Amino acid sequence: MALRSVSRRLGSRILNQRSFVASLHSHATSFGFQEVKEEEKSKLVGNVFTNVASSYDIMNDVMSGGLHRLWKERLVGKLSPFAGMKHLDVAGGTGDVAFRIYDAVYSVKRRALQKVDEASLEETQIYVCDINPNMLNVGKQRAAERGLRDNKSLVWVEGDAEALSFDDNSMDGYTIAFGIRNVTHIEKALAEAYRVLKRGGRFLCLELSHVEIPVFKNLYDLYSFQVIPNLGELIAGDRESYQYLVESVRRFPPQERFASMIADAGFEKVEYENLVGGVVAIHSAIKL
């Protein structure tokens, strides 16, 4: 799980290559293994998450054997939440990451160690932004079940990662978990993340990634393509959506290339950490 850093120079070269290729196919993008028009992808992805919203959390448990919980704890640990922070969790509709950030901020032990006063605590705002209202509704219901329906620290916002409604330099932190591979233009989402963060703000992305160990990769591919779609059909009654989710991972840039894209968005101190041999990776960076 060693951290790896990336240079801006490599990022520029890779981004230029990607831009050249993109210019040849400027009106096409990937939806899983399919090539679709850019204007169609958002609707297709929206349909996927509308279909899976009600079973999204339980499927995460089943598909990962519960490991996604540990991965998200790792993500939040790297964020180091603090009282009074303004944080944006993008593609976070069901609230899984936001609730962990909330719990970290409001932890009695953490507050005692940091000598936090109540006034600072009340200034905390965690914005949960998702383009899909069905996913947000699941999150709001979960908040109600936790007794947080009217909590002022949690704000639910329907919005697009590529065109955020938040002010420049307004956020202390930005997280996106298992979401950025579903946007049509990753570069735009990264640019928006950079725009809304304050100087010194932290960017953190948890995403399914590329396994680097050959033998493990073969087993992982077998599990992904033969087991996960069947689980989707059995548990969620939706094979096609989970087939897309599996395929979308393979179309997502490898760890080094994605790190370079983050650097080219303007971020500094770009690093990534592979978990479970690269099944997932956490990319982190700072806006200086």
From Swiss-Prot:
> Can you cite a GO biological process for this protein?
methylation
Reactions catalysed, as given in the entry: a 2-methoxy-6-(all-trans-polyprenyl)benzene-1,4-diol + S-adenosyl-L-methionine = a 5-methoxy-2-methyl-3-(all-trans-polyprenyl)benzene-1,4-diol + S-adenosyl-L-homocysteine + H(+)
Pathway of this protein? Cofactor biosynthesis; ubiquinone biosynthesis
Q: How does it sit in the membrane?
A: Peripheral membrane protein
Q: What is its EC number?
A: 2.1.1.201
Pfam (any one): Ubie_methyltran
Q: Which UniProt keywords apply?
A: Membrane, Methyltransferase, Mitochondrion, Mitochondrion inner membrane, S-adenosyl-L-methionine, Transferase, Transit peptide, Ubiquinone biosynthesis
Transit peptide: which range? 1-27
Supply the enzyme class, top level.
transferase
The record ties this protein, via InterPro entries, to: SAM-dependent_MTases_sf, UbiE/COQ5_MeTrFase, UbiE/COQ5_MeTrFase_CS
Q: Name one GO molecular function term.
A: 2-methoxy-6-polyprenyl-1,4-benzoquinol methyltransferase activity
What are the disulphide bonds in this sequence? none
One cellular component term (GO) for this entry is: extrinsic component of mitochondrial inner membrane
Assign the protein's first listed, main location to one coarse class: mitochondrion
Q: Where does S-adenosyl-L-methionine bind?
A: T94, D130, D160, A161
Subunit structure, interactors included: Component of a multi-subunit COQ enzyme complex.
Q: What is this protein called?
A: 2-methoxy-6-polyprenyl-1,4-benzoquinol methylase, mitochondrial
